Swiss-Prot record:
Family under the similarity heading: Belongs to the class-II aminoacyl-tRNA synthetase family.
Protein name: Histidine--tRNA ligase
The organism's place on the tree of life at top rank: Bacteria
HAMAP family per the UniProt record, alphabetical: His_tRNA_synth
Record-listed E.C. numbers: 6.1.1.21
Classification via PANTHER family: HISTIDINE--TRNA LIGASE, MITOCHONDRIAL-RELATED, HISTIDYL-TRNA SYNTHETASE
Oligomeric form and interacting partners: Homodimer.
Species annotation: Psychrobacter arcticus (strain DSM 17307 / VKM B-2377 / 273-4)
Disulfide bond as UniProt keyword: no
GO cellular component: cytoplasm
Reaction catalysis annotation: tRNA(His) + L-histidine + ATP = L-histidyl-tRNA(His) + AMP + diphosphate + H(+)
Gene this protein is translated from: hisS
Length: 442
């Protein structure tokens, strides 16, 4: 028997109903803020991710699912490991920034070759939200406020903690990177193996090392906050002021750097204590250089150039402001199951059972009910015996079963059985057409 690939999971109907419920709440909040839905390809050119994410990141070096197509010459392609790069590519390709400040959201699968564990899979799903065109700190605060409202709507507000940091501008990070490398080079032998490698490829990622020994070394390391310019400091302080005015609590985490190279200024994470090591549920920040950077992609070796850029922090391209976040849906559902479980959502409200001799009348009744009550989920079984159909009705989770036999046809009535109490009554054929008589369960 062929089975699903390791790290790629089926989402079966009972669980899928909870996914749809979650996605509807998230979409509702996004609609309240005026964000528009965009659908993006799951496959992009490999160069896009190498340039956007950074050639020295774990994602590009070790985690991407890449292949070449059958064109001549072959084109290197990659299953998307994240959504921001594709969203920026779409904004550039379709000139969405021309005279506008698009606010977009998307939802769907992402792919990374990682060791599968609870809350971390090789195919996983993200909600991505991107706001383009504003360099002002209110755009940062708006996204954070939006996520705060999402937690409130999902009953998770008390389970989430907001962490903030500022990465400053490119030249400020470059100066800090040099100071950090100088400090750590003398202590290189005390670093864990990953941090030793990152010292020459992506030293800022050492700040979020999970190794206690490395964190101990960082206590006396130079602080990024001391390298920020006046404008970066003012921007970050204004974000904090907005959040305070909105009543959103936060904590400053000076080691928060994020795992993608495109971020600048504000970065943030929503974390929880309920999911063990997979504590981050939502994360994002500002990426003012990425739109302009991807506009300037040429035919050079993108991965090699991205590594060179990460090392030398080359001359910045024109700033095209943007800010966004991504939310892991698997982790979010794990958190919901732990603290505010979504009740089982039945796939059926009304089950129609019809005697085989009048089965066509049952089909007609069910179809008319679907027209008159589009809010109801109406099911029927095949034209087997009444007993067999009733067994299926019992298993369906329906609140009511409508029974139609010759007697009901003659009397122009229906028999209605309450599946919870077992009580049965006779009613007019149009009884269920009146919402006052029966409302569907949420």
């Amino acid at each position: 028997m062929i089975k699903a690939i390791k790290g790629f999971n089926d989402i079966l109907p009972a669980q899928s109903a909870k996914w749809l419920y979650l996605e509807s709440i998230l979409a509702d909040v996004l609609g309240r803020y005026g964000y528009e839905h965009i659908r993006l390809p799951i496959v992009e050119q490999t160069d896009l991710f190498a340039r956007a994410i950074g050639g020295a990141t774990d994602i590009v070096e070790k985690e991407m699912y890449s292949f070449t197509d059958k064109s001549d010459p072959p084109t290197p392609l990659t299953l998307r490991p994240e959504g921001t790069a594709g969203a920026v590519r779409a904004v550039n390709e379709h000139n969405l920034l021309r005279g506008d400040t698009p606010k977009l959201w998307y939802i769907g699968p992402m792919f990374r070759y990682e060791r599968p564990q609870k809350g971390r899979y090789r195919q996983f799903h993200q909600l991505g939200v991107e706001s383009f065109g504003s360099a002002l700190p209110d755009a940062d605060a708006e996204l954070i406020a939006m996520t705060h409202l999402m937690w409130q709507e999902l009953g998770l507000k008390d389970e989430m903690r907001l962490q903030l940091n500022s990465l400053g501008e490119r030249d400020e990070r470059h100066a800090y990177r040099e100071a950090l490398v100088t400090y750590l080079t003398d202590k290189q032998e005390q670093l864990d193996e990953d941090s030793k490698r990152r010292l020459t490829t992506n030293p800022l990622r050492i700040l979020d090392s999970k190794e206690a020994s490395t964190q101990a070394l960082l206590i006396d390391a130079p602080k990024l906050a001391n390298f920020l310019g006046e404008e970066s400091v003012a921007h970050f302080e204004q974000v904090q002021t907005y959040l305070t005015e909105l009543g959103i609590d936060f904590e400053i985490n000076p080691h928060l750097v994020r795992g993608l190279d495109y971020y600048n200024k504000t970065v943030f994470e929503w974390v929880t204590d309920k999911l063990g090591s997979q504590a981050t549920v939502c994360a994002g920040g500002r990426y003012d250089g990425l739109v302009g950077q991807l506009k300037s992609i040429d035919t050079r070796d993108a991965k090699a150039d991205a590594k060179a850029d990460a090392k030398a922090d080359s001359k910045p391209v024109k700033s095209e402001p943007a800010v966004g976040f991504a939310m892991g849906l698997e982790r979010l559902l794990l958190l919901i199951d732990a603290v505010a479980p979504i009740a089982d959502i039945p796939a059926c409200d009304v089950f129609v059972v019809a005697h085989p001799e009048v089965y066509s009348a049952g089909i007609g009744y069910a179809q008319n009910l679907r027209y008159s009550r589009p809010d109801l989920r109406v099911k029927m079984a095949s034209a087997t015996s009444l007993k067999a159909q009733m067994k299926k009705a019992d298993k369906s989770g329906a609140a009511l079963t409508v029974i139609i036999a010759q007697q009901e046809i003659d009397d122009k009535t229906i028999s209605i059985k309450d599946m919870q109490t077992g009580e049965q009554k006779t009613a007019a054929q149009d009884w269920l057409s009146d919402k006052d008589n029966f409302c569907r369960r949420k």
